[in-house]
């Protein structure tokens, strides 16, 4: 409502009526105790995306992907692809009660898992950094509870919520970056938040816009049906995406690969 209308109300009806219209105290809030927004884009300097099927891209398609129309990541994910060996999820959580609410647990609940994807691999290598990770989830564990980030072995990490909790007042926001990893298989999962709301404990579920999140472990190069390189690995070739024979790279691990791709 404009300032002119507010001034007119004040002049015509007095301070009490003005306050009742413009200075109403916030009413009780219904719905879930925490608003969870998954619309924020993660910064991906580099990534690996595997497809369940073998993709035979033509040069014209590679040229389109190289110019970012569409982005190769989006193209592959729209065709059933999964990041590997980890996927990053950015969430913004916001308190939605008059009193403070507290997040006391987050779990990645697996819906199904099977052999890692082997159709095609898109490998975009990066020389840059990554966003700071808030929590880590090991999908190879029997239960994938939130862990403190850091270290090479997820099984040795401390449970995040044994030492932390996340308290949110009304409208207070916090950004979380979650990493889910697998070194053994492909998994689909959803996130379960456990929230204390006054005297009640509530479970809130988060998925990827109506679908489960996905992650796959990486196979050796020669186990993929087709292979595409991008990122800094192709700068010597003029940049963009290039197709290579997976057998030419043998049994090397894509995640630790540091060689050239040839031009």
Which residue ranges define each predicted feature?
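Short acidic, flexible loop segments centered on an aromatic residue
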Residues: 104-113, 150-154, 193-197
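Long, charge-dense
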Residues: 112-154
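Low-complexity, intrinsically disordered segments enriched in Ser/Thr together with acidic residues
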Residues: 155-187
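Ser/Thr/Pro-rich, low-complexity mucin-like regions
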Residues: 179-202
